[in-house]
């Protein structure tokens, strides 16, 4: 930052030749100083730390993260080990900042063992693997559920439709694929190799993590991390606080050469003066982050780099590379700065003098004590008198003294249990030195036999000494050659890394591929940012919202599919076709693979979500029972999914089942599948129709079709259904629709019946074709094809063995959209062989045409080609569109002659509730109230669009949704809304018309 003051004389002297007056110089310097201060404040994001921190703790976190984040230490609440918790939040943000934050699926980040509710509330593009390894994990999940419920209840609009993205699987068992991962204090339970194996299972190449670090763990059995006020201690097992007194040599040997210890050693972390929860972790896992360098696993080599060690926290990164790794010596060392002023002293650990241990003592204390002991030693005095002299000096050098009324610490206090043994060891050391010096002197005057024995080679003398030690162990102190041990201030680890991974990794090709992918994604993000900036500039300043917007994933045909489950053995036929020299066959095979993977992930996500709820409610994989707080768990999940319910073995449901809803499957200890009335099971919204796994399996069993795909891309109301009716030939054709409602409409248009045997045989949904037996045909007529995934369309053609597909749809209306935000959808867009346009509408009245043109101009990026800029209407109705403001849902005029559409499910639910209050027939609120997405393809005389909230809703800004809403009517369209919504495309265009 700039200094807070400046010297006017120096400014004039240095700038006077430029002709500026003193006042101008002052103004210029003040402006520059202010700008620099503003830039300093803006350079980091705001991070609010609510924990109460001491002045010292505040300095620790500011020194570590103050330069990167705009820290706001609000001192709101006391929390257990508050600094560690505050650092954990900053560590999470710091590790996430290492990766792209585009919000695209290809930039998904995994969090091994993290807090999923933190990412959910902050809108992070993160999937958490949060396994339930014990009671503490289940307690944390329960607490997170409560926090999530509390936040959602305070601001339901912000979280409308959002689901927390996490699973309860161990990291190595989760199937979500992502290139990046973080592990915030999660490595204690996995170790270095465990993290590498989890990365391999997820297809992860870079992981960044943190953990508590103290190099003295390699030497000591206990210690303190002063910045965290944390004391650590090695114990042999979780139930016996016995010290690990393994000698240093044994510890280093075990560290370097052995992976197996006789007894499992744990490290207990306790926070000093805080009677709160402590932590116990396996020493082998912790040690692996200090000693290991690389690990080769399933064709990948993973290397760890220790990046920053600050405030007792080590930040590390693990990077996986494929292919061959040539031999290389990897070296790192761990320093022990806390023992540089100490020396090791061996003292007795047992009364028989057989067991000895090493203690640390200040070099200055030992040096002065030994000097006095050597000078005052007299072999004619009783050993106890000399022992008392040593103890007196030792006490004086390690106690508190008072000088001129001021207390001063002399040296360092010695453990009361070691004090007398230290003095005794110094006495023995002194006596041994005098005896050794005496023997050296006597050798000058020794007899010939003594001289001959002394002249023996050292190996012979060592042999005799070893024999005496083995036969007479209690004599060992007399022959002890070393009492003092020089303590090394570091330990070094060298490891040769070499791995034959098969093919060489083509880094150049990978760099070109990543660059191409990044350019494509960057253009998408730039367009989204420009659109958001234009929206903000068009809004009044006092109404700008600070809430973050998560960019939506955009299909990109230049990159590979990430996020699907890899099942190569089951995809051999389609996989081979993806390498076909015929481009369209390769494209169709790739799309079918993606569609199969997408449906499989939908199924896996459903199972994962239900298993999570089952476990939260106290269930397991063995018993058909739940033991948790059912009401609390299900009330919490009900806020995000109103279809969540529990069926008891008595046949009773916890909540009333909505009318007309029948659950086809349920979940319990036997997994997901059909259940009987006598079983205990749970359900959610995905259990009504659960056919994703079957669709995936069927698609995998097919081959990509080679027939011709023709698309008629027509405007809304151009007569697509009429065209299907005119060209349909029962002997050679089958009509396929995207959903059940469209199938019923086509059946009524062709056969005047929606459920007759003939109508159901010739007009079927795409799902019905794939899941049921059906005859082969030569031609498929597809209605509203844009609602289908390209892979599903190809699967339908393959199942029917059709040589031609004639597809009708509007490429600018609502297209197929993923129901799983974590899936990287890239090949869903239809790729036709032939395309024809139809720009004349017979449905939409005359005044709708200029409205849609205006919407296209405002919503679509400049340069975008749209057939709606030139479309025309043949309707005789000239004026049809009106709008009015309403105060609440009670003022919506519900009329059985009108068709009602909403943008959101919440508004639809409000209208249905209002219809029930007015005792309108069930057929009305079942068939006459739909969302815009559900009403695509529908044609009605009178349509009313209802918006009951003025909170942010991006659907009112999207051209495709607004286009569908405004083109469903033939006679009248009425827009009824509550309040003003910034960016409401329909309202703005109606106002300008």
Curated annotation (Swiss-Prot):
ATP binds at residues 714-721. Residues 712-975 are annotated as: ATP-dependent helicase. Residues 687-838 form the (+)RNA virus helicase ATP-binding domain. It is found in: Host endoplasmic reticulum membrane. Interacts with RNA-directed RNA polymerase 2a. Belongs to the bromoviridae replication protein 1a family. This is Replication protein 1a. It comes from Cucumber mosaic virus (strain O) (CMV).
């Amino acid at each position: 930052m700039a200094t807070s003051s400046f010297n006017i004389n120096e400014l004039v002297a240095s700038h006077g030749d430029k002709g500026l007056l003193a006042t101008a110089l002052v103004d210029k310097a003040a402006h520059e100083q202010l700008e620099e201060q503003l830039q300093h404040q803006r350079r980091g994001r705001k991070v609010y730390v609510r924990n109460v921190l001491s002045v010292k703790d505040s300095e620790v976190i500011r020194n570590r993260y103050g330069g990167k984040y705009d820290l706001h230490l609000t001192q709101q609440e006391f929390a257990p080990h508050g600094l560690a918790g505050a650092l954990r939040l900053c560590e999470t943000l710091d590790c996430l900042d290492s990766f792209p934050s585009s919000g695209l699926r290809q930039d998904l980040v995994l969090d091994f063992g993290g807090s999923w509710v933190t990412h959910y509330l902050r809108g992070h593009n993160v999937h958490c693997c949060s396994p339930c390894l014990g009671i503490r994990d289940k307690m944390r999940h329960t607490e997170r559920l409560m926090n999530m419920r509390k936040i959602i209840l305070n601001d339901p609009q912000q979280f409308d439709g959002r689901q927390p993205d996490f699973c309860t699987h161990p990291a190595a068992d989760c199937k979500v694929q992502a290139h990046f991962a973080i592990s915030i204090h999660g490595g204690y339970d996995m170790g270095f190799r465990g993290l590498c194996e989890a990365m391999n299972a997820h297809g992860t190449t870079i992981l960044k993590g943190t953990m508590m670090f103290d190099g003295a763990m390699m030497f000591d059995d206990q210690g303190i991390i002063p910045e965290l006020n944390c004391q650590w201690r090695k114990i042999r097992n979780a139930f016996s606080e016995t010290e690990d007194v393994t000698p240093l040599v044994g510890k280093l040997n075990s560290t370097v050469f052995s992976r197996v210890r006789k007894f499992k050693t744990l490290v207990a972390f306790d926070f000093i003066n805080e009677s709160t929860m402590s932590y116990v972790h396996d020493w082998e896992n912790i040690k692996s982050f200090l000693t290991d360098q690389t690990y080769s696993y399933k064709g990948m080599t993973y290397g760890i780099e220790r990046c920053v060690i600050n405030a007792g926290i080590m930040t590390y990164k693990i990077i996986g590379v494929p292919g061959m790794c040539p031999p290389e010596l990897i070296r790192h060392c761990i320093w022990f700065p806390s023992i540089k002023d100490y020396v090791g002293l061996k003292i007795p650990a047992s009364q028989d003098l057989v067991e000895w241990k090493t203690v640390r003592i200040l070099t200055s204390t030992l040096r002065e004590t030994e000097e006095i002991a050597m000078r005052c030693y007299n072999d004619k005095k009783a050993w106890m008198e000399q022992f008392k002299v040593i103890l007196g000096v030792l006490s004086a050098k390690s106690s508190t003294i008072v000088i001129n009324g001021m207390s001063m610490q002399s040296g360092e206090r010695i453990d009361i249990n070691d004090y007398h043994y230290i003095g005794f060891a110094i006495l023995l050391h002194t006596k041994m030195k005098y005896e050794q010096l005496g023997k050296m002197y006597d050798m000058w005057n020794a007899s010939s036999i003594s001289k001959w024995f002394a002249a023996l080679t050292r190996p012979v003398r060592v042999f005799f000494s070893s024999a005496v030690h083995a036969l007479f162990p209690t004599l060992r102190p007399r022959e002890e050659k070393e009492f003092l041990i020089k303590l090394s201030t570091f330990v070094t680890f060298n490891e040769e890394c070499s791995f034959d991974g098969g093919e060489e990794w083509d880094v150049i090709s990978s760099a070109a591929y990543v660059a191409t992918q990044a350019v494509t994604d960057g253009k998408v993000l730039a367009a989204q940012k420009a659109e958001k900036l234009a929206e903000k500039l068009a809004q009044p300043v006092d109404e700008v919202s600070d809430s973050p917007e998560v960019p939506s994933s955009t299909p990109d045909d230049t990159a590979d599919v990430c996020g699907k489950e890899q099942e190569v053995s089951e995809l051999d036929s389609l996989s081979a076709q993806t390498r076909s020299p015929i481009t369209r066959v390769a494209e169709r095979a790739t799309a079918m693979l993606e569609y199969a993977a997408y449906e499989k992930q939908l199924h896996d996500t459903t199972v994962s979500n239900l298993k999570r709820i089952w476990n939260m409610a106290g269930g397991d994989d063995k018993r058909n029972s739940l033991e948790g707080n059912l009401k609390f768990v299900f009330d919490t999940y009900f806020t995000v999914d109103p279809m969540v319910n529990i069926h008891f073995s008595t046949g009773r449901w916890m909540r009333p089942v909505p009318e007309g809803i029948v659950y086809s499957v349920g979940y319990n200890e036997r997994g997901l599948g059909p259940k009987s009335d006598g079983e205990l099971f749970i359900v959610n919204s995905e259990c009504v129709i659960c056919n994703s796994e079957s669709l995936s399996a069927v698609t995998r069993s097919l081959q990509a079709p080679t027939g011709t795909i023709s698309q008629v891309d027509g405007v809304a109301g151009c007569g697509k259904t009429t065209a299907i009716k005119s060209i349909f030939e029962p002997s050679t054709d089958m009509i396929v629709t995207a959903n059940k409602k469209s199938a019923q409409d086509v059946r009524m248009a062709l056969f005047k019946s929606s459920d007759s045997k003939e109508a159901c045989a010739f007009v079927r949904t795409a799902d019905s074709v794939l899941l049921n037996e059906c005859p082969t045909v030569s031609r498929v007529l597809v209605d509203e094809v844009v609602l289908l995934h390209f892979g599903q369309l190809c699967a339908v053609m393959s199942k029917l063995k059709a040589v031609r597909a004639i597809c009708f749809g509007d490429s600018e209306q609502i297209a197929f959209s993923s129901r799983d935000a974590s899936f990287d959808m890239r090949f869903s867009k239809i790729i036709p062989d032939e395309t024809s346009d139809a720009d004349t509408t017979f449905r939409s009245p005359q005044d709708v045409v200029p409205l849609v043109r205006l919407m296209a101009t405002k919503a679509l990026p400049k340069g975008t080609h749209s057939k709606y800029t030139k479309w025309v209407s043949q309707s005789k109705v000239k004026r049809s569109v009106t709008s009015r403001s309403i105060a609440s849902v009670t003022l919506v005029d519900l009329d059985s002659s009108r068709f009602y559409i909403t943008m959101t499910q919440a508004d639809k639910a409000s209208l249905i509730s209002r219809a029930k209050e007015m005792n309108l027939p069930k057929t009305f609120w079942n068939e006459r109230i739909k969302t815009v997405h559900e009403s695509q393809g529908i044609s009605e005389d009178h349509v009313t669009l209802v918006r009951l909230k003025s909170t942010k809703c991006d659907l009112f800004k999207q051209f495709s949704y607004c286009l569908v809403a405004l083109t469903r009517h033939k006679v009248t369209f009425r827009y009824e809304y509550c309040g003003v919504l910034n960016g409401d495309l329909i309202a703005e265009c109606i106002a300008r018309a």
